[in-house]
Amino acid sequence: MRWSDRLLKNALTPGLAFALLLAGCGFQLRGEQKLPFDTIFLNTPPNSPLGATLSRQIRSGTDTRTVPQASEASAVLEILGEARDKDILTLNAQGRAVEYKLIYRLRFRLHDGKGREYIGPTELRAQRDISINDSQVLSKESEETLLYRDMQTDLVQQLLRRIAAVRPHADQG
């Protein structure tokens, strides 16, 4: 066996073994999410970042269409509220906060617009820790903004997974 053949064999074997392990454990890239509704109305405040994120995720990651009127939709996603909180985790010797816990909460419900509730009022919650250094206040503010945006995206993904688990015709006879 030539040196180049042996090198090729030694390089391919671990890669092939790794690929087989991943395939065997069920790992797969996140593909298109299947929502059980053809159309959905997003009841969010106009020009809200949350509404824009929801709409973008539904448009790009599902085959469900968003519609402008609740009467046209087979499901209505109602955002009941969202909140951002910031709790102090750690104080330094001078009594200044050096570490915070950022919390993002999202409350929603999903119904058909005609009285049938698919998901009752539910709160999703995400949190991240952030440390603060007095010399890096401005960069930490932008990091805080990015962390809140990241948490919002995470909660939108959780929300879409919950919607995907809904069985709209399960208890109809």
Where are these regions (language model features)?
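Acidic/histidine-rich, surface-exposed loop or edge segments in extracytoplasmic proteins
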Residues: 34-41, 135-141
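Bacterial signal peptide processing site
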Residues: 26-28
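C-terminal motif of bacterial Sec signal peptides marking the signal peptidase cleavage site
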Residues: 21-24
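C-terminal/domain-edge helix-coil "capping" segments
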Residues: 138-173
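Bacterial N-terminal signal peptides that target proteins for export
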Residues: 2-14
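N-terminal segment of the mature soluble domain
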Residues: 36-83
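Surface-exposed short loop/turn segments
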Residues: 78-123, 129-145, 161
